[in-house]
């Protein structure tokens, strides 16, 4: 996520064999790579995982990854704004695949969907990302930048986004808009919302309206279910009816998946 490291061991049956979340802010440095490698080895030991059966390591980052997976081309949420070689990969002693976090999240969501139809994926976390899968194939675009939903313009001339432009969806619907603006953690925000805090309620109402506008636009372009993931998604179930009503108000023909 840029602020912490999440390790998960998964087998080919999609069963989670181990999970751990650690505070490790991302740095594109050899020292970070060595620290990452040490934590990986400790994780394997802690869960008694057989290294001889380890097929490889998948790493995801909130940014645009070069086609050869050796560089980060653009990732404003981790302060990378031009193509930068990945200096942290060299210390990992296993086959590694590096990819965009939303692309991986989208593929995981598609894999677990019944029928496995085409779908869009909207990731609402520290940043806002997306993915589009057409019949199971990830559409990446000519420059591997497709489905960057977080940087479509929601409000021209509006809030400044981390990318430098104004009005991007990320500036309105990232997790930071719910937590940072009020000086709360995401968990604390929703706890206060549940307890009837007026400021949190106003922020959340605006958030849902902006999210509905984004969902309507994505659906209008791609004409497929839109699946919501990321750290905010775990808090959405109680508000699905309200969100669906806002979407229908904007576009009565839109049918959203969530």
Where are these regions (language model features)?
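N-terminal helix-turn-helix/winged-helix DNA-binding helices
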Residues: 1-3
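Conserved hydrophobic/aromatic positions in well-ordered beta-strands
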Residues: 6-10, 131
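Short, ordered coil/turn segments that flank beta-strands lining enzyme active or ligand-binding pockets
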Residues: 12-13, 68, 134-135
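Glycine-rich phosphate-binding loop and adjoining helix at the ATP-binding site
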Residues: 16-120, 238-253
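Glycine/GP-enriched mid-protein hinge/lid loop-to-helix segment characteristic of carbohydrate kinases
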Residues: 18-22, 27-32, 86, 94-199
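Adenine-nucleotide phosphate-binding core of ATP-dependent small-molecule kinases
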Residues: 30-50, 169-171, 177-237
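Short secondary-structure boundary segments
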Residues: 61, 124-126, 230-231
């Amino acid at each position: 996520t840029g602020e912490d490291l999440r390790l998960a061991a998964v087998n080919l049956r999609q069963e989670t064999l181990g999970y751990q979340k650690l505070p490790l802010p991302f740095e594109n440095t050899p020292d970070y790579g060595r620290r990452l490698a040490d934590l990986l080895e400790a994780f394997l030991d802690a869960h008694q995982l057989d290294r001889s059966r380890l097929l490889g390591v998948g790493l995801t980052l909130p940014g645009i990854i070069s086609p050869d997976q050796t560089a980060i081309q653009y990732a404003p949420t981790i302060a990378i704004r031009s193509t930068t070689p990945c200096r942290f990969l060299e210390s990992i002693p296993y086959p590694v695949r590096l990819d965009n976090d939303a692309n991986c999240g989208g593929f995981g969501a598609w894999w677990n969907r019944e029928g496995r139809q085409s779908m869009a994926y909207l990731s609402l976390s520290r940043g806002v990302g997306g993915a589009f899968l057409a019949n199971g194939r990830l559409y990446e675009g000519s420059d591997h930048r497709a489905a960057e939903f977080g940087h479509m313009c929601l409000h021209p001339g509006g809030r400044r986004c981390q990318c430098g432009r104004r009005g991007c969806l990320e500036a309105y619907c990232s997790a930071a808009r719910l937590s940072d603006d009020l000086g709360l953690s995401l968990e604390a925000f929703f706890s206060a919302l549940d307890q009837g805090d007026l400021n949190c309620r106003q922020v959340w109402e605006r958030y849902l309206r902006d999210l509905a506008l984004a969902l309507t636009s994505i659906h209008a372009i791609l004409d497929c279910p839109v699946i919501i993931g990321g750290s905010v998604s775990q808090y959405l179930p109680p508000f699905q009816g309200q969100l669906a009503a806002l979407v229908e108000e904007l576009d009565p023909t839109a049918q959203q998946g969530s």
